């Protein structure tokens, strides 16, 4: 009987092993630094995105600033299906804003390969602009299951965000979706939302602009920027009926600007709960050293999921309770 149990155990292990899916081409293309990815170093992302809550779709344009570390005539752009790339422009001289070249490209699974007619030499900085649109994958159980999040708050107002550490940032914007390459010069995220819905859009870092586009598309534009290197999955929009307030923390590197953003309906309990934040920062700095992003400030943003460590704009969804939803782990 004992020998039979051992045999059955080995058979079960074998069945489980053979049932595992093999690595496919899409995994290799996204996970490896192949010849179409390893020749350039991302320096900066500039992202402009407009979500449509009713259609659960987005329209956007993303610009890359990059440095060629060796010459090449092909470049890989990551954008997961069913998102669609409309066009790609190459700026051979990234700073002159002129002489853009439209690139031909082919799609394969979750990537695009664009052909560069005139080889970019080693040491040359160049720019890429990608126009795109589509219905991004919707997160079913964020943050563990990634994608775009479309919810409503208790007052029926749209509440949107993204969680994409596992899936990668290419689930919603075209990028070099590899965690080895962070843009050293940071990133800018502009989010457009309908003016008539009174929504606020928040991104990483500091707000650098807020403009009304009533004469063009009746949208409000909120632009945010980080100056520190940032992982692509950490660049995240938060959109909702937010209210905010600020305070200053005197930390190990001087003055740290703290901003809080919460849903209007939760503002009273949020003010009370977030009184702990300066003490938390003090404890972390005592044990782990200075907060690394003083230049970009520190934000706590109420999110439509439990939470994520999104750099300089922490996603918070713990219902304003201590512990894990009010209980110890």
Model-derived regions: residue spans:
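Beta-strand-rich interaction surfaces with strong enrichment in secreted/lumenal proteins
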Residues: 47-50, 64, 101-104, 115-120, ...
């Amino acid at each position: 009987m004992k020998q039979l149990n051992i045999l059955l155990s080995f058979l079960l292990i074998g069945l489980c092993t053979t049932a595992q899916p093999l690595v496919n081409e899409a995994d290799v293309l996204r996970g490896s630094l192949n010849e179409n990815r390893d020749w350039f170093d991302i320096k900066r992302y500039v992202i402009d995105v407009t979500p449509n809550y009713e259609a659960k779709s987005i329209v956007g344009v993303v610009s890359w600033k990059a440095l060629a570390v060796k010459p090449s005539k092909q470049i890989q752009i990551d954008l997961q299906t069913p998102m669609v790339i409309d066009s790609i422009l190459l700026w051979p001289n990234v700073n002159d804003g002129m002489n853009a070249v439209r690139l031909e490209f082919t799609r394969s699974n979750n990537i695009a390969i664009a052909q560069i007619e005139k080889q970019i030499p080693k040491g040359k900085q160049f720019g890429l602009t990608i126009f795109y649109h589509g219905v991004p994958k919707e997160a079913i159980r964020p943050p563990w299951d990634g994608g775009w999040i479309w919810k409503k708050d208790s007052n029926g107002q749209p509440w949107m965000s993204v969680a994409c550490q596992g899936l990668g940032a290419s689930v919603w914007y075209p990028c070099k979706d590899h965690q080895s390459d962070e843009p050293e010069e940071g990133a800018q995220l502009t989010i457009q939302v309908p003016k008539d819905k009174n929504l606020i859009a928040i991104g990483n870092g500091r707000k650098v602009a807020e403009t009304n586009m009533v004469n063009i598309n009746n949208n409000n534009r909120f632009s945010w920027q980080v100056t520190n290197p940032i992982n692509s999955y950490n660049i995240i929009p938060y959109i909702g009926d937010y209210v905010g307030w600020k305070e200053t923390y005197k930390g190990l590197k001087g003055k740290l600007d703290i901003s809080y953003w919460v849903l209007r309906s939760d503002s009273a309990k949020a003010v009370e709960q977030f009184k702990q934040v300066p003490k938390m920062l003090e404890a972390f700095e005592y044990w782990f050293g200075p907060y690394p992003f003083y230049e970009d400030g520190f934000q706590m943003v109420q999110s439509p999921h439990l939470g994520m460590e999104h750099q300089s704009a922490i996603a918070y969804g713990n219902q304003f309770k201590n512990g894990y939803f009010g209980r110890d782990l």
